[in-house]
Design a protein with these regions (language model features):
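N-terminal pre-catalytic "stem/leader" segment of glycosyltransferase-like enzymes
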Residues: 1-89
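Catalytic core of nucleotide-activated saccharide and alditol-phosphate transferases
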Residues: 75-180
Length: 180
């Protein structure tokens, strides 16, 4: 008997979630898990957005880059409902995942945005894994890489208006954090 079954609820978006599903199909192929697909056409509306100042807003927008799963222990029959939030923005959260899931694994994880969320929500959110902040200690010509990274991001954020210096500072801080 295979000890675990995962129910994969069909996602609203496949571009980001394909590597999660591919991994599950491979685990099934190896006989490590049983995998069942459940068709889900549910809209899953609702986003919770945390601003840089900590203000929380809710919208009725869909959060299609969040995929949902159920893990079943076939021995003791316990179940865990979880989601993988593969959205690019660390400050956007799926309302449905926060309300209904036991665990949420977030690709763009930043604990600073979690601090503002209610305790029952923030205790559910974990980093997805090696998706950001991964680097080699053997960085050949690292100064070129860092300069190119900085210049391309300054170019993207450059807009001559009253927030120019604020954006440039944010870019420098962000790139330094990602580099370290």
């Amino acid at each position: 008997m295979i000890p675990y079954t995962i129910i994969l609820y069909t996602p609203q978006e496949l571009n980001h979630s394909s590597y999660i599903q591919t991994g599950l199909f491979e685990l099934k192929r190896l006989g490590i898990i049983d995998l069942k697909i459940k068709i889900s056409a549910k809209k899953r509306l609702g986003r919770i957005i945390v601003s840089d100042t900590g203000e929380i807003t809710e919208t009725k927008q869909a959060h299609p880059k969040t995929s949902f799963y159920k893990l079943i222990d076939n021995i003791d029959k316990s179940e865990v409902f979880f989601a993988c939030d593969l959205y690019d923005f660390a400050n956007h959260f799926s309302k449905e995942a926060l309300e209904k899931c036991d665990f949420i694994f977030k690709r763009s994880y930043d604990h600073n945005y979690l601090e503002t969320l209610p305790k029952e929500y923030k205790n559910k959110v974990y980093p997805l894994g090696l998706t950001f902040g991964v680097h080699s200690n053997d960085k050949e010509e690292s100064y070129k890489f860092l300069i190119g990274l900085f210049l391309s991001n300054v170019n993207v954020s450059f807009k001559p208006d009253r927030n120019l210096f604020k954006r440039l500072k944010k870019t420098v801080v962000s790139q330094k954090r990602h580099w370290e």
